[in-house]
Amino acid sequence: MAEIVDCFADRPIIVGSGLAGLIAALTMSPEPSVLVTRSALGAETSSAWAQGGMSVSLSPDDNPSLHLADTLAAGDGLCDAVAAESIILEALDAFHVLQHFGIHFDQDSNGHLALGLEAAHSRRRIVHVGGDRSGTAIVQALTACVLNDPSITVLEGLEARHILMADNVVCGLLLANPTSEIVLPSSRILLATGGIGGLYDATTNPVSNFGQGIAMAARAGAVLADMEFVQFHPTALHCHNRPLALVSEAVRGEGAVLINERGERFMADIPGAELAARNIVAQAISAEITRGGQVFLDARQALGARFSTRFPTITALCHKVGIDPVHMPIPVCPAAHYHMGGIAIDHQGRSSIPGLWVAGEAASTGLHGANRLASNSLLEAVVMGTRAARDITFHNTPHPLGTIPITPKKPDTTLIRPIVSQCLGVLRHAADMHRAIAALLPFVEGEEESSDPAIVALLIAIFAYLRTESRGAHARTDFPLKHDTTQRRHMTLEDVLEIAHSCVAQRKEKIS
């Protein structure tokens, strides 16, 4: 039986210690809050692994309108333009917030901010820290601030398992570790639980990030949005490790080119070439690999000996697998990297469930549309983490705890990853998605270790099955063209289960 911990009653609970969670906790201060993280504070978060940086218009030839135009173009017709504009207009504020918390962005030899260029950006607007150590440096600085703030209680080593509801509103959170189970009563929960890359064999995310926040919110009845859109980073370091190391877009921004095993630059004739939107580059690389070829990122001519200075982290990662990027091309492949979909929220971070806010990759704001523009994710995390935190401070209506369920088992993705990797990858087809839906449904309804990962995977599969076009990061070989008009899709888990059962029944009829 879970122990009810009353000493933190009705404090806001923040789940996750990536950029969005850390910023939210610091923004709420001095109001007392509880920050829950399944590992050490700031560890095992995608934020800490970010190499590129944050996008903000700072150069004389740039402005928010150009940034918005690039974002909408990358989003391939599916961005919420109002949400995107409002977030981008706060980019400068987000930049100053990070500076306020002690983050010192890189400067050039003249003492000016060093602005990087990444794929699908029309201007240099990526601020970074320590070359390619942006995420690590930012998370370390914010973690120090959180640990030094007496208003923030940090609970490490606890995994959120279930959102407690009473009369359709949030009333608490059920957490567990290998030795104990506890309940934190609260009418205010902010999920900043990250993405879903851990559902894939090839991922650049922490492998434990399978979408736990999405699964919990879905079981509680929250509306989900755009779940089909999974961004595959085109250039993960191709090796046998899991997760795969990221070879940042910034390397291509500095002039590195993609070649196949014959030394051919296969992106040269594609608009934007190596700096085309991520979905285009990932699909081109996948096509080369599917035909049995190999793909390499060649920085020898563009950077040469400067590579190790500009990209020290990537250099070290390459050296670990026997690659010297100064003298050798880097073997690369696409890997699940970022989820544009998630829990649907409004402009203040509120979900469809009273008392539940969401920020960061777990949320779907509409900023990214069908395909995220590089380095917009850190921007979104800061802006939406700040907004949600401010909104939460205006809401505090305690609700008594309802029935406390049996604690769900610790999630395990082992049985789900092969299904997702084979059927919901860069290139998709209805036959594969049918197989995925049929395979996932028993896990969803089984209440076992695979249940929560299967819920998230099934959401992706059904959303993808219903989108009968290729748009942004969602590419279907059976529907290679885009519809003339399109719209975002919003559904609950109940909606998805109804469609899934119908799909399985139809498949059985065809087989019989």
UniProtKB/Swiss-Prot annotation:
Binds 1 FAD per subunit. Signal peptide: none annotated. This is L-aspartate oxidase. GO terms for biological process: 'de novo' NAD biosynthetic process from L-aspartate. Catalyzes the oxidation of L-aspartate to iminoaspartate, the first step in the de novo biosynthesis of NAD(+). It holds the Pfam family Succ_DH_flav_C. Its EC number is 1.4.3.16. FAD binds at residues 17-20, 46-53, 361, 377-378.
